[in-house]
Amino acid sequence: MPRKGPVQPREISPDPVYKDVLVHKLINKVMKDGKKSKAEKIVYTAMKNLAEKTGDDPLTALHKAIENIKPVLEVRPRRVGGSTYQVPMEVPPRRQISLALRWLVEAARNRSGKGNYTMIEKLTNELFDAYNNRGAAVKKKEDTHRMAEANKAFAHYRW
């Protein structure tokens, strides 16, 4: 345990194009092997395509898509008297964003279809689906909420 108190979260600088921290976090999630310029190209093109599809501002569309993916509840394991219970808990705001971005990128990478889809097309389609409250990332959120709802009886074990 550190003696200097809780660790302060780092200040994340906004991205240069949209001047938004969420876009910067998405770029970092998409990035593989330190190839940031490639990740930026993927995200910016996907956002431009999303804006064309929705007819909305790209930043507004992204924020709405992320808002539709953010989980409010999740289950955490808690050991009580030799057995482990899945206890539903509220998700802190920072974790909501990080889970939403993780699920979005994961769903985009796992997305398949006929032909060779690029990551740009996959991310665009997944963002569009999330914008319209459907898709794999939104399903993951609903599954998480369903699991929390099913284990509501163990909510009194919260710590």
From Swiss-Prot:
CDD domains per the UniProt record, alphabetical: uS7_Bacteria
Top-level taxonomic group: Bacteria
The protein's assembly and partners: Part of the 30S ribosomal subunit. Contacts proteins S9 and S11.
Disulfide bond annotation, renumbered to this chain: none
Function text: One of the primary rRNA binding proteins, it binds directly to 16S rRNA where it nucleates assembly of the head domain of the 30S subunit. Is located at the subunit interface close to the decoding center, probably blocks exit of the E-site tRNA.
Keywords per UniProt: Ribonucleoprotein, Ribosomal protein, RNA-binding, rRNA-binding, tRNA-binding
GO molecular function: rRNA binding; structural constituent of ribosome; tRNA binding
Pfam families with a match to the protein in the record: Ribosomal_S7
CC terms in the record's Gene Ontology section: small ribosomal subunit
Keyword Ribosomal protein found: yes
Alphabetical list of NCBIfam families matching this protein: rpsG_bact (TIGR01029)
GO biological process: one example: translation
Protein name, as recorded: Small ribosomal subunit protein uS7
